[in-house]
């Protein structure tokens, strides 16, 4: 098989080695979803083992589609935030069964497919102004960095200031130095190691940073510096093969959708919430990562975006059938792009690893969050550099861009950043009389109105 011709590697100024490293890196930075998603959906009453298999399988299928239909280095998996909405709001909060929630996700996926085939999502992507697209990239960078700081527990909750820096003297979560403290220290060391590797232009610097940090953690565990305490949430860093190699059955969740919810008034609200967050998280990720990788053309459009959007839509539908919440394009795809990934070969490698994770789950689940956190922080820095592309000389462009940027990390949502960016862009340009001069797309006005209505009624 000629991978160069299949994925147009030379045209995209990349090679097989770079793409493979990028795919591995992306997978490593988002492998946590294999552990986190089952934990979250289990709260809704779903079988943990079945959800693990559904998570890995739906990620594999959706990411393979991304490689085949778009030839872009984007990787898909059940989205964080959407899974929490599924479990804690729809099921535990509103009282619906997880089977009914899966039906809502399935219907959302079907609508997504129709929207993708009719170019609606592509039109939305193209309607967003270039400066706002660069702002989305920067905002996602800050958002990723903040997630990394949280995963490393460098940033912790604070009742007075909402967040504060971790203290080795007093842990807010009740951990000790040998459980929590040492992992924070390892994350900081890992951040410095990854930064130095980046400065030295070491190939695969982000992946090496993850592996070295994990390796240091294993050494700390073997020497007694890190003491696992599973009951308190501090797990062993060594892969556990005590149960051998087996794939958990997906039977408890496969095709268990209950469509009786379709006839309930709340269904429209539930489905729209899934639809809205999935659509604009995906668009935000595509805009941000593609902008950073210089994949956008001179008009700010992403060639062959339809294939990427269709892969995302089909992934959501397949995910619901398997038994998991909404599948979406992961912002961690930026880590692979930062490693030089530019084609579908990157996503194919990540997809294969998701497939292998079904058999080698003990290895992938042993990679701790403190080892992947430095990678997220560094990727955040790399995406932040797009701020230089924003036109700060034009306040009608700069202020909406600023609002979009700060909204993402502060509101912990890519879609909220896009919403506020679009609303502020339209209002500021209309009031200042710049709208006609800039020929703002009609679709931007429609989006602004829809976003305002969302804040009023949802």
How should each PLM-predicted stretch be described?
Residues 13, 17, 189, 268-272, ...:
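Alpha-helical membrane-protein architecture signal
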Residues 59-80, 111:
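Juxtamembrane transmembrane-helix boundary signature
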Residues 39-50, 89-100, 264-268, 368, ...:
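Helix-coil boundary and interhelical linker segments in multi-pass alpha-helical membrane proteins
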Residues 24-31, 64, 68, 145, ...:
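Hydrophobic/aromatic residues within the transmembrane alpha-helices of Major Facilitator Superfamily
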Residues 45-64:
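Loop-to-helix transition at the N-terminal end of transmembrane alpha-helices
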Residues 1-50, 169, 210-305, 449-453:
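Helix-loop-helix hairpins and the membrane-proximal interhelical loops
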Residues 94-212, 348-458:
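Membrane-embedded alpha-helical modules
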Residues 2-37, 58, 79-88, 92-140, ...:
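Helix-loop-helix junctions within the multi-pass membrane cores of secondary transporters/permeases
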């Amino acid at each position: 098989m000629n991978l160069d011709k299949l994925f147009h590697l030379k045209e995209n100024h990349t090679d097989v080695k770079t793409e493979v490293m990028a795919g591995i890196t992306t997978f490593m930075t988002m492998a946590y979803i294999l552990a986190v998603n089952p934990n979250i959906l289990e709260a809704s009453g779903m079988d943990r083992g079945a959800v693990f298999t559904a998570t890995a399988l739906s990620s594999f299928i959706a990411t393979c589609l991304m490689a085949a239909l778009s030839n872009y280095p984007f990787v898909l998996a059940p989205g964080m935030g959407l899974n929490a909405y599924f479990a804690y709001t729809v099921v535990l909060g509103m009282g619906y069964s997880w089977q009914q929630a899966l039906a809502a996700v399935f219907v959302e996926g079907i609508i997504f497919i129709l929207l993708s085939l009719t170019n609606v999502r592509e039109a939305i992507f193209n309607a967003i102004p270039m400066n706002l697209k660069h702002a989305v990239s920067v905002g996602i960078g800050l958002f990723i960095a903040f997630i990394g700081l949280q995963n490393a527990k460098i940033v912790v909750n604070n009742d007075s200031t909402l967040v504060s820096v971790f203290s080795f003297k007093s842990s807010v979560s009740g951990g000790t130095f040998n459980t929590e403290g040492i992992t924070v220290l390892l994350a900081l060391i890992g951040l410095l190691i990854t930064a130095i590797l980046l400065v030295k232009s070491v190939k695969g610097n982000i992946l090496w940073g993850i592996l070295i940090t994990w390796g240091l953690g294993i050494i700390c565990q073997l020497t007694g510096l890190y003491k696992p305490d599973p009951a308190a949430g501090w797990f062993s860093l060594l892969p556990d093969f005590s149960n051998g190699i087996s794939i958990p059955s997906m039977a408890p969740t496969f095709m268990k959708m209950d469509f009786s919810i379709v006839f309930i008034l709340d269904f429209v609200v539930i489905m729209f919430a899934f639809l809205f967050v999935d659509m604009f998280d995906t668009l935000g990720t595509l805009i941000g990562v593609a902008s950073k990788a210089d994949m956008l053309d001179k008009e700010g459009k992403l060639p062959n975006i339809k294939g990427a959007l269709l892969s995302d839509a089909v992934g959501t539908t397949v995910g619901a059938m398997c038994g998991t919440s909404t599948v979406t394009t992961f912002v961690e795809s930026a880590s692979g792009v930062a490693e030089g990934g530019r084609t579908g070969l990157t996503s194919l490698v990540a997809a294969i690893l998701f497939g292998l994770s079904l058999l080698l789950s003990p290895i992938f689940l042993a990679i701790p969050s403190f080892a992947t956190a430095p990678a997220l922080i560094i990727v955040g820095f790399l995406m932040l550099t797009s701020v230089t592309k924003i036109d700060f000389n034009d306040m009608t462009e700069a202020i909406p861009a600023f609002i979009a940027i700060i909204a993402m990390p502060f509101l912990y949502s890519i879609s909220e950043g896009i919403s506020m960016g679009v609303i502020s862009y339209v209002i500021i340009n209309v009031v200042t009389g710049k709208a006609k001069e800039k020929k703002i797309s009609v679709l931007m006005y429609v989006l602004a109105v829809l976003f305002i209505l969302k804040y009023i009624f949802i």
